[in-house]
A protein has these predicted regions:
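A common structural junction motif
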Residues: 82-84
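Short S/T/G/P-rich N-terminal loop/turn motif that feeds into the first structured element of a domain
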Residues: 1-60, 67-79, 92-110
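Short, conserved catalytic or adaptor-binding loops enriched in Gly and charged residues
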Residues: 87-91
């Protein structure tokens, strides 16, 4: 059984990005991994989870966690990020937004 914990630590940001592919899942995942490697080296990056729709193999969601909004914005406005964003735009359409976690739960938490 899981238990709810309190709000997320102050300042953390969650970036949610949905993708609809115009290419194969394999090609998309390769491009995504290159982008993720770049972001993993940026200050404030905490982690990500890329998930694929169970029934629609061309539909993905990326959920990335950042220490704060400023770190996220600094990373995605770097000139070195541009080729990564362009590569993903060339093979998919996407929609994205920044969120702040309000509640979470994990197994065994009290």
């Amino acid at each position: 059984m899981s238990a709810e914990s309190g709000p997320a630590p102050s300042g953390q940001a969650t970036f949610v990005n949905t993708f609809t592919l115009r290419t194969t899942p394999e090609e998309f995942e390769e491009a995504f991994v290159r982008t993720a490697r770049f972001l993993q080296g940026q200050p404030g990056f905490l982690g990500y989870s890329l998930v694929r729709h169970l029934e629609e193999s061309r539909s993905y969601v990326n959920i990335a966690r950042w220490a704060d909004v400023a770190s996220f914005r600094a990373a995605v406005t770097r000139a070195e990020f541009r080729p990564h964003a362009e590569a993903l735009r060339a093979i998919s359409t996407s929609s994205s937004a920044l969120y702040t976690e309000r509640r979470s739960a994990t197994v065994g938490e009290r």
